[in-house]
Design a protein with these regions (language model features):
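N-terminal signal-anchor transmembrane helix
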Residues: 55-74, 105-109, 114-115
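Short His-Asn-centered micro-motif
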Residues: 77-79, 209-213, 298
């Protein structure tokens, strides 16, 4: 148990942003009175820590900037709460993979300089379980990279955690890339490539393993960046995904937000953005070369993760399963008995899913 409770954090994750990014994200946005103290403290810590960012930038340019990637990444896609974290943890047992860590999500500019000191303090302060679902939390565990990207540039969907009134705007522009400018897209390409190189350097891997739900809406751009990337798309019962996402977003946003959003508005955003993400993926998966995409139901993966992992490796021609199998088996064995949240779907939840997400129920063959 960490020193601080997640929902009582006096600052939010923008403390790890560079100063230029912090200013760009918050410029022209009104901070609600209840959060101005958190905003000011976050701003002050960010301003202080960002003075250290040039130290990493110097090392990055010297060691990594001109070094090409050995392999295109493997991307685990799927809407939030579709089981992507479990799959990410399973695949990351393979040491040829490199990944973004929990520490890196908050302090992406303090990776190549100062990491031991700041990581030790973060480990001491943070909880050891994810408050929404009891999944383990630790500074060196694999983590999705969107929070790290949000601290490296202002062009990410996760700005909505801080400014939720603009969630739909951020979704259209930075989740789906519908309204993004060429200049913003170039920044995304450069910063994401930089994050990948630092992640591989940090974890010692040779191929980047990404678990990042927002990438589900960016398939066309990702294929352009990485023509031979492999994609695993996870599907899960939409009733479970809705209930779990609503719970996850409602709880996670509390210590991060700098303005209020009503539960009703957040719920409507979950419903509409799920549909946007679903249709964007369905439209753009055609750009993935044949043999580089595998679509998997999470329920099938969860039922026999070992066999399914081997099947995915072989289907996508990912090397190294035999060498990684003992570590993967050990991790999966350690998850037996893990208590997941149990959801009961009331009549209203069932109605909302059936009215808004019938397309997914029908295509994937799910029912209550």
């Amino acid at each position: 148990m960490g020193l601080l409770e997640f929902n009582k954090l006096p600052i939010n994750t923008l403390v790890g942003a560079d100063w230029k990014t912090f200013k760009a994200i918050t410029a022209g946005r009104e901070i609600d009175p209840a959060y101005r103290g958190k905003y000011r403290l976050t701003k002050a810590v960010c301003r202080l820590l960002s003075t250290l960012a040039p130290l990493q930038e110097k090392r990055y340019r010297k060691l990594l900037a001109d070094k090409p990637l050995e392999h295109d990444p493997v991307f685990i896609l799927g809407h939030w709460r579709s089981g992507t974290t479990f799959m990410h943890n399973v695949f990351s047992c393979d040491k040829h993979f490199g990944y973004n860590t929990t520490y890196q999500t908050v302090f992406p500019h303090l990776m190549m300089w100062g990491q031991p000191f700041f990581k030790e303090n973060m480990s001491w302060l943070m909880p050891d379980k994810r408050p929404t679902d009891n999944m383990e939390l630790a500074v060196d565990l694999p983590q999705e990279e969107e929070f790290a990207l949000a601290n490296m540039m202002p062009y990410t969907y996760y700005n909505f955690w801080f400014l939720p009134k603009y969630q739909q705007e951020y979704a259209d522009k930075y989740l789906l890339f519908n309204d993004i400018s060429d200049e913003e897209l170039k920044v995304f390409e450069d910063i994401f490539t930089k994050l990948i190189k630092i992640s591989l350097w940090n974890t010692g891997g040779t191929q980047f393993l990404s678990k990042n739900p927002p990438h589900t809406g960016r398939v066309k751009e990702l294929v352009k960046m990485f023509p031979n990337a492999k994609f695993i798309y996870l599907m899960r019962n939409p009733y479970t995904v809705f209930e779990s996402t609503r719970n996850f977003f409602t709880n996670t946003i509390q210590p991060l937000k700098l303005e209020d959003i009503s539960p009703e508005a957040l719920e409507q955003n979950v419903l509409s953005i799920y549909a946007k993400l679903y249709h964007k993926y369905e439209a753009d998966k055609q750009f993935i070369p044949e043999g580089n995409l595998m679509e998997v139901k999470f329920e099938d993966f969860e039922a026999d993760a070992m066999a399914m992992t081997e099947h995915i490796y072989k289907s996508l021609s990912i090397p190294g399963f035999e060498a990684a199998a003992p570590a993967i088996s050990q991790y999966i064995g350690g998850k037996k008995g893990y208590k997941k949240n149990k959801y009961k779907y009331d009549d209203r939840t069932v109605r909302l899913v059936e009215e808004n997400w019938k397309f997914a129920l029908d295509q994937w063959g799910y029912s209550i």
